[in-house]
């Protein structure tokens, strides 16, 4: 596939871009800084500038695309990850502006250029727990895509707005637009660096409801979306299968979630339900912090 990927130089994006490139996809990375990954083209741009987005969608991805003499090819898909990645990096209103306006511009350009598959990064923060003022408990466990989204911060608000924006574009266009509520992304080097501390101090993972997503498995999730057509608008949680701490489901519930309704769950099953992605997309996360630390 010929894929336009925004934000491919970021923490989550660079692993997804590498995964897609290794799987044979042609990827144009659009970001404020170049990725420099072999076989991936880079284009520097600002997603909040609609003119720059329209220009990129109508431009060649590399010199080789000049050779056929048939004009600029249409992208097969857009993967939109570019954003202010969390709160407290800039002012609240700037975080909200960049994330909402940028997403509008990318999806608008994609639809107007006839790109029929759009995948965008939403967030675990939409559920209102991660960046809450004080402790917020889920209404039930595990959290699935039907759980209420009531965020308190500008970052999570922007992600909820982006889901509404995407739904509106999908209804008008009929294209496939899938949103990924991505949990805390873990890069391979972070297992040895951080997870012993999480085992010793599980409180550190409470705001992420003890869940995580391996950056390489996130790449697989993106490709699962690329390979699945005809779903219209859908939202998917993205997480690995197990808790990010060395406590059982029962122990975590007793310590942190007293009074929260809990469905029947396995002893290490994530509180951030990924069953929808498995059923509808064939998502099959391969990594676990336990095997990463042991081998």
What are the functions of these language-model segments?
Residues 122, 163-188:
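Conserved beta-loop-beta element that borders a ligand/cofactor-binding pocket
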Residues 36, 47-98:
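NAD(P)H-binding glycine-rich loop region in Rossmannoid oxidoreductase-like domains
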Residues 105-152:
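Conserved Rossmann-fold NAD(P)-dependent oxidoreductase catalytic core, especially the SDR/UDP-sugar
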Residues 97, 133-174:
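Catalytic helix-loop patch of NAD(P)-dependent Rossmann-fold dehydrogenases
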Residues 172-176, 185-200, 224-235:
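Glycine/proline-rich active-site loop of Rossmann-fold NAD(P)-dependent oxidoreductases
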Residues 3-23:
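N-terminal Rossmann NAD(P)H-binding glycine-rich loop of SDR-like oxidoreductase domains
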Residues 145-152, 179-213:
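A conserved pocket-lining segment of Rossmann-fold NAD(P)-dependent short-chain dehydrogenase/reductase
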Residues 216-295:
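C-terminal substrate-binding subdomain of Rossmann-fold SDR/epimerase-dehydratase oxidoreductases
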């Amino acid at each position: 596939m010929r894929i336009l990927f925004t934000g491919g130089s970021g923490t989550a994006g660079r692993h997804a871009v590498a995964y897609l490139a290794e799987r044979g996809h042609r990827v144009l990375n659009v970001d404020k800084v170049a990725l420099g990954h072999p076989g991936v083209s880079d284009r520097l741009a600002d997603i909040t500038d609609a003119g720059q987005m329209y220009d990129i969608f109508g431009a060649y991805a590399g010199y080789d695309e000049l050779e056929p003499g048939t004009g600029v090819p249409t992208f097969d898909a857009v993967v939109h990850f570019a954003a202010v990645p969390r709160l407290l990096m800039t002012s609240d209103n700037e975080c909200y502006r960049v994330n909402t306006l940028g997403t509008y511009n990318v999806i608008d350009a994609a639809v107007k250029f006839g790109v029929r598959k759009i995948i965008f990064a939403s967030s675990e923060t939409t559920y209102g727990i991660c960046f809450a003022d004080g402790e917020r408990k889920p209404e039930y466990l595990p959290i699935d895509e039907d759980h209420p989204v009531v965020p308190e911060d500008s970052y999570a608000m922007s992600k909820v707005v982006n889901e509404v924006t995407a739904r509106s574009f999908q209804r008008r266009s009929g294209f496939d637009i899938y949103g990924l509520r991505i949990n805390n992304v873990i890069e391979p080097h972070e297992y040895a660096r951080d997870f012993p501390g999480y085992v010793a101090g599980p409180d550190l993972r409470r705001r992420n409801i003890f869940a995580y997503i391996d950056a390489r498995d996130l790449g697989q999730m993106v490709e699962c979306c690329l390979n699945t057509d005809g779903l219209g608008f859908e939202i998917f949680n993205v997480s690995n299968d197990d808790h990010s701490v060395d406590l059982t489901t029962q122990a975590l519930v007793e310590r942190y979630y007293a009074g929260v309704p809990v469905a029947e769950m396995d002893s290490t099953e994530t509180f951030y339900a990924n069953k929808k992605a498995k059923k509808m997309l064939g998502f099959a996360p391969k990594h676990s912090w336990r095997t990463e630390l042991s081998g």
